[in-house]
Amino acid sequence: MSGMFYNCFSLAALNISNFNTSSVTEMDCMFTGCSNLVQLDVSKFDTSKVVTMFCMFSGCYKLIQLNLSNFDTKRVTNMASLFHNCQALAKLDISSFDTSQVTDMGAMFTYCSKLTQLDFTLFDTRNVTDTRWMFEHCEKLTTIFISDKWSMDRVTNAMDMFKECCSLPGFSPEKTGIEMAKLIEHGGYLTLKK
């Protein structure tokens, strides 16, 4: 299903509620550039075999709601640019994501300029190697919750991970890289959820 609705920029509505996705392995760029979509119901998607979600919702500028609570991401390795340029999303619940196999989270939330909070408490980032531009231009983001599963040990590229995240506590435009991907009390931008 990679690129299935790629650059369907005139599309204002889309009924995909009857899609059988149980055998799908790739959803790269599936809705990329659907810039006029306001709502998109993917709540019934079976993603249990999907291994890559690169740019899946990238450029869905007007999307105001996205229910991903039933997404099974245990096989996914690539989440780069997954929500890139979802500028109208004010809320995004990804707390149920299994990220244990993910290696690439680069630009995952870039230009999600209305998001105020993200919950990574169930995120296992021990295999992630790329977090470049992950939160770039998330100007309203005030809180990023993490747990003890959060690890940057394998990351080799974290360039401008927090660039323009000016609402994060203690933000400094000179400090936007991996050195800030730690708890606030240790000099970073992240919050331990209690």
Task: List each model region and its residues.
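Negatively charged
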Residues: 2-194
